[in-house]
């Protein structure tokens, strides 16, 4: 949907991000004389998730740098898949946000520089919740809440992920925003908070990383709740939306 919404540049961001991740892993295995691991698909997933978390207007060198950092410094240098102590895609995004902050937070779309729905909420402005839910509000490439929900539910049904982490993440985040977000438990406000700012992507696709998340049901519920709480804290107290 992000490619449909944002066009060729968004497609190139995704393509470069995935290709850079795969190439970085291939070259590392070649130089280190390790068995080739690109066929497991994890590099593709890392590149795709990183690309979907980026602004559709980022310069094309940014997804390349982010994917290479994620694969080499977060995954390969720690022993490869199953040994990384952080989510590669999420860590790559954090690295890019620190290194290229202005480009990462620029949503200059259709010739107009627009605030994201979450930035508008923090400023006390009205938000088009329907546009945010469907993915037509200024956001990252993978910012359609509807598409993220469909993908997340599909993964839960097919066993790709378990429901405990997303459920506890969203429940705790929603409760925190209701208590401390400044608008009480207004359903429209809470719905807008859930649909924006990467909450659904984090709940379904980042926090559920099988390598860096707990394996027991209780651990998953606790982990999801803690991440949801931290997301609420960052949303309320953080300077960046």
Regions of interest found by a model, annotated:
Residues 82-149:
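Long hydrophobic alpha-helical segments that form multi-pass transmembrane helix bundles
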């Amino acid at each position: 949907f992000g490619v449909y919404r944002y066009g060729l540049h968004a497609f190139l961001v995704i393509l470069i991000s995935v290709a850079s991740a795969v190439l970085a892993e291939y070259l590392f295995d070649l130089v280190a004389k390790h068995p080739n691991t690109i066929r497991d698909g994890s590099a593709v997933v890392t590149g795709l998730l990183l690309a979907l978390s980026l602004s559709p207007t980022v310069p094309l060198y940014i997804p390349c740098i982010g994917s290479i950092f994620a694969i080499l410094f977060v995954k390969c240098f720690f022993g490869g898949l199953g040994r990384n102590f952080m989510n590669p895609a999420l860590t790559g995004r954090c690295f890019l946000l620190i290194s290229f902050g202005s480009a990462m937070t620029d949503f200059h779309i259709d010739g107009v520089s627009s605030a994201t729905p979450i930035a508008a909420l923090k400023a006390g402005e009205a938000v088009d919740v329907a546009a945010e839910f469907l993915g037509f509000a200024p956001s990252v490439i993978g910012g359609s809440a509807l598409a993220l929900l469909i993908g997340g539910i599909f993964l839960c049904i097919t066993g790709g992920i378990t429901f405990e982490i997303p459920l506890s993440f969203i429940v705790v985040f929603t409760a925190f925003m209701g208590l401390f977000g400044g608008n009480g438990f207004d359903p429209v406000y809470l719905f807008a908070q859930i649909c924006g700012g990467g909450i659904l992507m984090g709940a379904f696709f980042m926090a559920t990383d099988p390598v860096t998340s707990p394996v027991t049901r209780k651990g998953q519920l606790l982990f999801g709740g803690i991440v949801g709480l931290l997301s609420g804290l960052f949303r309320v107290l953080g300077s960046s939306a």
